[in-house]
């Protein structure tokens, strides 16, 4: 978290503030997670500038919630990483936008066209039941499933009000690239 310079969530607690009482904060988080009583606090919605001049919503969790998410990520990632498509670069270990650019550069010698695709509101409209079924296909630990479901359902604060979302639909969380796999299934010969 420190490396990617994450900002404070709704509670205004920075990484430095969290570290000031690290033992206490980690114990409280562990105690709540291990007892099943941890509920993610609301995610703070911020608008991020896009290069085309528009904006996109991004959900900023609290530092403590990011620590909790990291715990679950450490369990989930080794299980699902081998399943992800080789052309998926977003939010993956040892892969970055630079790797994607390198691959795009290599491929431009074989193709003279490119698809630039953005599905507006993709993560805002994901069906949570479908997401959970996909996760349950790979993950069996009930406590992990419990917290993933709670994160999917976490409220989103925009300013001083909770954003109403459709039952079972997404929110502006920073999510892994799901569109690449769908594209590969629909256009399997495109590299």
Question: Where are each of the predicted segments found?
Answer:
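Charged boundary/loop elements
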Residues: 1-17, 74-90
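Amphipathic alpha-helical blocks
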Residues: 7, 17-40
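Conserved polymerase palm-domain catalytic core
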Residues: 32-47, 51, 83-191
């Amino acid at each position: 978290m420190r490396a990617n310079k994450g900002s404070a969530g709704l509670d205004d607690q920075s990484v430095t503030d969290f570290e000031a009482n690290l033992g206490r904060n980690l114990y409280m988080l562990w105690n709540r997670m291990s007892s099943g009583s941890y509920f993610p606090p609301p995610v703070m919605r911020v608008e991020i500038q896009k290069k085309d001049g528009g904006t996109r919503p991004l959900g900023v969790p609290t530092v403590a919630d990011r620590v909790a998410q990291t715990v679950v990520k450490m369990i989930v990632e080794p299980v699902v990483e081998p399943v992800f498509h080789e052309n998926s670069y977003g939010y993956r270990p040892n892969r970055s936008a630079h790797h994607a650019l390198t691959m795009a550069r290599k491929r431009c010698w074989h193709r003279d066209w490119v698809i630039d695709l953005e599905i507006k509101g993709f993560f805002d409209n994901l069906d949570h039941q479908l997401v959970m079924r996909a996760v349950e296909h790979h993950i069996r630990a009930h406590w992990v499933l419990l917290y993933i479901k709670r994160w999917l359902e976490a409220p989103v604060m925009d300013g001083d009000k909770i954003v109403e979302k459709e039952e079972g639909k997404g929110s502006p969380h920073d999510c892994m690239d799901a569109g690449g796999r769908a594209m590969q299934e629909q256009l399997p010969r495109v590299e």
